[in-house]
Design a protein with these regions (language model features):
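Membrane-proximal envelope and lipid/glycan-remodeling enzymes
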Residues: 1-197, 206, 212-401
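Long, distal/terminal scaffolding or interaction modules
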Residues: 200-201
Length: 401
């Protein structure tokens, strides 16, 4: 009997947990189902059901401004089930794949199974990943998809380093959340490093750096990486032209000009928004109540300081130095647009925008605990997971009933 690979088992457990918590309830904010229906009819504008669906009124028609990858993933299901397609179910599956990929990354980094289980549990429940997947709304499934494909890109970079596949996963990530495009220079850097120096663990299932790297020049992966990204860029410009009549994407800027929280001119990314974003990410607390349930997470969120303190494990990562530096740079690059944006992710539990850079921090956490897992790390992960589960319970009990 063939033994199930641990990464697949981790993915199945994550799917089961997320499905159990979400009850696979369809989200009313199924913008990607509407977009998939539109694409199947050969158009970019959606049949707008009403104001509860965020869509940009442009030229008398309504358009989804979010990155479209989840809609493309839904195409075969929408072709069969139409408007009844359950967008939340896709979010649940993507969360499972993200956790499975994380487990595989942990193996390639040389983690013990017990340490890997703790880190993967943190990725699912200790961040906003579980909450986003359980609800499955248009904004939330985008985060889940971005985490999923970012983890897959990191797995490939820690393995065979096929440039075209890294580019494909990276494109899927930034076509889920646009901010993920900021990680591309880091991926390119890791592709150009000599393979035997870039893979942290050379003992993992025969994937030794030496055997895979012999005879391969450092430029070959980068060429295929660039070719795939170039093709994606052409398709992206065509999609923009179909929506806006221009090759560039003006969706978010136009939305910002129409939004009550925005401004009639200028960019949605400004240094003037930095103080509020930093307060949101690191200070904002839930409101204390006199009675049950004692705490109320406001719609504006709760800082990762209180929801995901186990992220501090990332600062312990020391080697391999190229990976440590690359992952920190990726996290910082991806964080920049999020800390300059005009809104902090409202409505949410925790700080959902942190999911854009948390995959890189989770990878750093893995490197940090390869040799020794500090006892306080277990405590912080357990706390983070309990807070994440509590957040799911609160929202499904009091908000999304």
């Amino acid at each position: 009997m063939t033994r199930l690979r641990p990464a697949y088992a981790a993915a199945l457990v994550a799917v089961a947990v997320t499905a159990l918590i979400s009850h696979l309830r369809p989200t009313p904010y199924n913008n990607f189902v509407l977009l998939a229906q539109a694409l199947l009819h050969g158009r970019a504008w959606i049949d707008w059901p009403g104001p509860y669906i965020d869509a940009l009124n442009f030229g008398g028609r309504y358009y989804v401004i979010e990155a479209p990858l989840p809609a493309f993933l839904l195409l075969p299901f929408v072709a069969v089930f139409g408007a009844q397609t359950n967008q939340t179910a896709l979010a649940v599956v993507l969360a499972g794949v993200a956790v499975g990929a994380a487990w595989e990354l942990g193996e390639r980094f040389g983690l013990r199974n017990s340490a890997n289980a703790w880190i993967c549990a943190f990725l699912l429940a200790g961040t906003d990943l579980l909450w986003c997947a359980a609800l499955g709304d248009v904004w939330f499934i985008a985060h889940v998809s971005a985490v999923c494909f970012t983890m897959l890109a990191l797995v490939e970079l820690a393995g065979k380093r096929r440039g075209w596949l890294v580019a494909l996963f990276a494109a899927c990530a930034f076509e889920s959340r646009f901010s993920m495009i900021a990680a591309l220079p880091v991926y390119a850097y890791l592709l150009t490093c000599h393979l035997e120096r870039s893979v942290p663990n050379e003992r993992s299932e025969g994937r030794s750096a030496k055997s895979e790297g012999e005879g391969r020049t450092t430029t070959q992966p980068l060429v295929s990486f660039a070719v795939v990204l170039g093709g994606v860029g052409v398709l992206w410009m065509l999609y923009n032209f179909a929506r806006w009549g221009t090759w560039s994407d003006i969706g978010y800027t136009t939305w910002y000009h129409q939004d009550q929280a925005g401004m009639p001119t200028g960019s949605p990314f400004r240094f003037s928004y930095l103080p509020n974003e930093l307060w949101s990410f690191f200070v904002q607390q839930p409101t204390r109540l006199a009675g049950f349930p004692w705490l109320r997470p406001e719609f504006s969120g709760v800082a990762i300081t209180w929801t995901s303190p186990a992220l501090v494990l990332a600062v312990l990562a020391r080697s391999p130095i190229r990976w440590v530096i690359a992952l920190w740079v990726a996290a910082l690059l991806v964080a920049v647009p999020n800390v300059l944006y005009y809104v902090n992710g409202f409505a949410q539990f925790g700080m959902r925008h942190a999911l854009d850079f948390e995959p890189f921090l989770v990878a750093l956490m893995m490197l940090a605990v390869r040799d020794r897992f500090p006892r306080w790390g277990y405590v912080l992960i357990a706390y983070s997971c309990l807070v994440g589960l509590w957040g799911c319970w609160y929202w499904l009990t009091f908000v999304r009933t």
